[in-house]
């Protein structure tokens, strides 16, 4: 889901 992706990006900003 988008929520999971957004959370992942926030936790691991490349």
From Swiss-Prot:
It is found in: Secreted. Keywords: Acetylation, Chemotaxis, Mast cell degranulation, Secreted, Toxin. GO terms for cellular component: extracellular region. GO terms for molecular function: toxin activity. The modification N-acetylserine is found at residue 1. Its main location: secreted. One of its GO terms (biological process) is positive regulation of mast cell degranulation. Expressed by the venom gland. Venom component which lacks hemolytic or antibiotic properties, but produces an inflammatory response via mast cell degranulation and produces a chemotactic effect on leukocytes. This is Polybine-2. It comes from Polybia paulista.
